């Protein structure tokens, strides 16, 4: 039996060029597909991660309120809140304390609006008036529903039990970007009469799962229910309930210096869908710095094991501002001093707040107190705009209660 010899015949010319052409064409298509994917990835990266562009620059600042009976015979303006509505209107709020600078006493809620990205502001409107009660309203937190466009504003009544017995959590809302407001709604039938001091600052609406679309407003209590906890709504603000919170230690008892006592707080959502709550460290437990809580179930629960402290965020026991941009930049503002309310400073993080950039922006070296942050991003009047950050804060030359000022900051440092 003889074996077959290897063929020495030339390849069939009818098939060779076609086969080579086929594979050559495949290579072209493969390279084209790779190029397209890389281009898309680059575009996505540019859209999703703008960290290399960040050079915050203050482009404008103006006083919105001045204390000392210069506006509507109001003694003191305090507790600034600022938000950008889904339509791009800026709303700035403050407590207008009628007779004194005290946290107690009668007040208005003052509002100014801007429809041109903070260049001009409407005259002051007083949208809530508590009369002449001895322990009046206290702001507060503001949150918008991006699906309905409704803006919700929360405040408390009788939070200090000074000349009154029953506390209430109150709610007003606007469907026209703050032009008009509802009559106040008392939430006591839904959530009870335990003291809940919302904010001060902004609530959030979850943009990611879990519980995408949920409205979250966080705050703190007093001795009857101390610590930090949040109000939640899954029906666009029609009903509200509490999630569980993190209590102070010792619970329900007066606190001493260095006891654990989380207080005024500001939530924001991270890209993984978790919620961070940056809180005032009322009794300087562990450090003269901020308490950081984190929830992985849209604030249904806050667990002690998810409580940390941020030594980089030195703090003199104050309400601070915090906000995150759509690309994941976390901004934080406070008087950056371990003891005194001075040196209002803006910081930012590219790592979800686990570390902070060495660069900072000092907004005011002198007396400065509470602050609130808001961003405007995306298209404005049909044109794509670079992101803008707004800081509404208490500012003075001798004392931080002298005025409330708004600073506009270009995130990319462009004019």
From Swiss-Prot:
Post-translational modification as stated in the protein's UniProt record: N-glycosylated. Phosphorylation of tyrosine within the internalization signal results in inhibition of sialidase internalization and blockage on the plasma membrane.
Substitution effect: residue 270 to P: In SIALIDOSIS
Phenotype for residue 252 to S: Does not affect sialidase activity
Annotated consequence of substituting residue 351 to R: Does not affect sialidase activity
Gene3D superfamilies: 2.120.10.10
UniProt tissue specificity: Highly expressed in pancreas, followed by skeletal muscle, kidney, placenta, heart, lung and liver. Weakly expressed in brain.
Keyword vocabulary terms for this entry: Carbohydrate metabolism, Cell membrane, Cytoplasmic vesicle, Disease variant, Glycoprotein, Glycosidase, Hydrolase, Lipid degradation, Lipid metabolism, Lysosome, Membrane, Phosphoprotein, Repeat, Signal
Residue interval(s) of motif Internalization signal: 412-415
Reported effect, residue 240 to R: In SIALIDOSIS; type 2; no enzyme activity; retained in the endoplasmic reticulum / Golgi or rapidly degraded in the lysosomes
Residues bearing glycans: 186, 343, 352
Gene Ontology BP terms: ganglioside catabolic process; oligosaccharide catabolic process
Extent of the signal sequence: 1-47
Catalytic activity reported: Hydrolysis of alpha-(2->3)-, alpha-(2->6)-, alpha-(2->8)- glycosidic linkages of terminal sialic acid residues in oligosaccharides, glycoproteins, glycolipids, colominic acid and synthetic substrates
UniProt GO cellular component terms: cell junction; cytoplasm; extracellular exosome; extracellular region; intracellular membrane-bounded organelle; lysosomal lumen; lysosomal membrane; lysosome
BNR repeat coordinates: 112-123, 172-183, 231-242, 347-358
Keyword Hydrolase: yes
Placement of sequence motif FRIP motif: 77-80
Entry EC number(s): 3.2.1.18
Record-level Gene Ontology MF annotations: alpha-sialidase activity; exo-alpha-sialidase activity
Positions of disulphide bridges: none
Positions bound to substrate: 78, 97, 264, 280, 341
Protein purpose: Catalyzes the removal of sialic acid (N-acetylneuraminic acid) moieties from glycoproteins and glycolipids. To be active, it is strictly dependent on its presence in the multienzyme complex. Appears to have a preference for alpha 2-3 and alpha 2-6 sialyl linkage.
Domain notes from UniProt: A C-terminal internalization signal (YGTL) appears to allow the targeting of plasma membrane proteins to endosomes.
Record: disease: Sialidosis: Lysosomal storage disease occurring as two types with various manifestations. Type 1 sialidosis (cherry red spot-myoclonus syndrome or normosomatic type) is late-onset and it is characterized by the formation of cherry red macular spots in childhood, progressive debilitating myoclonus, insiduous visual loss and rarely ataxia. The diagnosis can be confirmed by the screening of the urine for sialyloligosaccharides. Type 2 sialidosis (also known as dysmorphic type) occurs as several variants of increasing severity with earlier age of onset.
Protein name: Sialidase-1
């Amino acid at each position: 039996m003889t074996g077959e010899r290897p063929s020495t015949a030339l390849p069939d010319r009818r098939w060779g060029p076609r086969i080579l052409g086929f594979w050559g064409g495949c290579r072209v298509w493969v390279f084209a597909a790779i190029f397209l994917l890389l281009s898309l990835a680059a575009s996505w990266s540019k859209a999703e991660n703008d960290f290399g562009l960040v050079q915050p620059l203050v482009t404008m600042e103006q006083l919105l309120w001045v204390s000392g009976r210069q506006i509507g015979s109001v003694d003191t303006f305090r507790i600034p809140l600022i938000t950008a509505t889904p339509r791009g209107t800026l709303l700035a709020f403050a407590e207008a304390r009628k007779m004194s600078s005290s946290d107690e006493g009668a007040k208005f809620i003052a509002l100014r609006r801007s429809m041109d990205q903070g260049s001009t502001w409407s005259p002051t409107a007083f949208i809530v008036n508590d009369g002449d009660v001895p322990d009046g309203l206290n702001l507060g937190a503001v949150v918008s529903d991006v699906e309905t466009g409704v803006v919700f504003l929360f405040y408390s009544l009788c939070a200090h039990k000074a000349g009154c017995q029953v506390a209430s959590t109150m709610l007003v809302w606007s469907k026209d970007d703050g032009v008009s407001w509802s009559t106040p709604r008392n939430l006591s039938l839904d959530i009870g009469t335990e003291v809940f001091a919302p904010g001060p600052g902004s609530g959030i609406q979850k943009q990611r799962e879990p519980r995408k679309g949920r409205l979250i407003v966080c705050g703190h209590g007093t001795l009857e229910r101390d610590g930090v906890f949040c109000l939640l709504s899954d029906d666009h603000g029609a009903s509200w309930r509490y999630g569980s919170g993190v209590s102070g230690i010792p619970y329900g008892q007066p606190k001493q210096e260095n006891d654990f006592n989380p207080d005024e707080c500001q939530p924001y959502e991270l890209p993984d869908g978790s919620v961070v709550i940056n809180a005032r460290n009322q009794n300087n437990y562990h450090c003269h710095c901020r308490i950081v809580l984190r929830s992985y179930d849209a604030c249904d629960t806050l667990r002690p094991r998810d409580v940390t402290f941020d030594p980089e965020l030195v703090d003199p026991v104050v309400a601070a501002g915090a906000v995150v941009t759509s690309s994941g930049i976390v901004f934080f503002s406070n008087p950056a001093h371990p003891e005194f309310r001075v040196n209002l400073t803006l910081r930012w993080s590219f790592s979800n707040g686990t570390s902070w950039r060495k660069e900072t922006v000092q907004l005011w070296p002198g007396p400065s107190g509470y602050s609130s942050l808001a961003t405007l991003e995306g298209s404005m009047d049909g044109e794509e705009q670079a992101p803008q950050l707004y800081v509404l804060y208490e500012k003075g030359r001798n004392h931080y209660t002298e005025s409330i000022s708004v600073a506009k900051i270009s995130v990319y440092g462009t004019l």
